Amino acid sequence: MLKRGNVTTKLIGVGALVLAVAACGAPPAKDTPAGAAGTAKSAQELGGMDKLVEAAKKEGKLNVIALPPDWANYGEIIKAFEAKYSIKVDSAQPDASSQEEINAAKQLKGNDRAPDVFDLGLNVALANKDLFAPYKVSTWEDIPAELKDADGAYYGDYGGFMSIGFDAAKVPAPTSVKDLLKPEYKGKVALNGDPTQAGAAFSGVMMAALGNGGSADDIAPGVEFFKQLKQAGNFQPVDPSPATIESGQTPVVIDWDYTNAAQTEKLKGKLDWKVVVPAEAQIGAYYNQAISKDAPHPAAARLWQEFIYSDEGQNLYLKGMSRPVRLDKMGDKADKAAKDKLPKTDGKQVFQTQQQADKAKAVLTATWAQAIG
């Protein structure tokens, strides 16, 4: 599956980006963005959207980082922004992790190729709030309070729920997490990554915990589940990818619903890939947008936020099978055809706090290797 953040590769990439900038001799930007755009906390503070658009077009450029074109439909989102505003988007290091976004911003501070905006996991956003410029988009009130910083330093943009993707021609449709222990799934169940390092895999173990008597505070039943899955011979220790799915090597994949659902579209006509979000184990998470306080293009950065939180931007996320943060407030403005393709969710939805996630990660670090060794 597509991942954001192979650490070794991305650290090399950030270093390469720094060297490339130095080689090009790009003129340094000021440490603090000049003009009102650098401190504006809303479009109104700049005189309204027309003034913001005018200022952004004058800058003429936007630097983004860690936005793979096939992830949450960012390829189309970037093209739509460029076409709408005639602003060039420079997309650097598309596979960088959230922490590597921050590392790049620190290393490139003062240069006109430094990231203007970030797309971050919550833990990294919380740890780096002092690097962000507070800004509230025009649709601020539509964003649930629990998914945004009260001051506008960062806020959820898109997310999803952990899911089970499966080849309907090779296995029966699972109706619960526990179904994966049945003989029909022998040698067929793959997890997207190492849960001690990858967010998707971590949430996969949390899903297993919820489906086996655990809670947001207790991941141990999830670790025990995967131990049983391994003992039953059902766990397939292969990193899933479109190629392993198409070849039949990984006919069952535990991953985010938007990445699994994207495979349904990609593999249409080749195999019948279906996705289910277990009703008893709905663990969700959102990525977060933030503007760099040192953004070399502060007006374009703010216009980017306005665009992706507009109906147009949110529908582009939806088209990419992710769940835009404003979806519940969009009503009939949401793209119905795209919305209808989302995996169904019925039941209690769980979103971990950072404290709960940190506790779970500590348990995983201490027990995972032994459980599946």
Question: What are the residue ranges of the model-derived segments?
Answer:
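C-terminal motif of bacterial Sec signal peptides marking the signal peptidase cleavage site
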Residues: 19-23
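Periplasmic-binding protein-like
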Residues: 159-163, 223-228, 234, 268-293
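A ligand-binding cleft/hinge motif common to bilobed small-molecule-binding domains
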Residues: 123-129, 246, 251-271
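Short, polar/charged alpha-helical segment
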Residues: 47-61, 67-88
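Mature extracytoplasmic/periplasmic domains
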Residues: 282-283, 287, 291-349
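Extracytoplasmic ligand-binding site segments that recognize negatively charged/polar headgroups
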Residues: 63-78, 90-106, 112-249
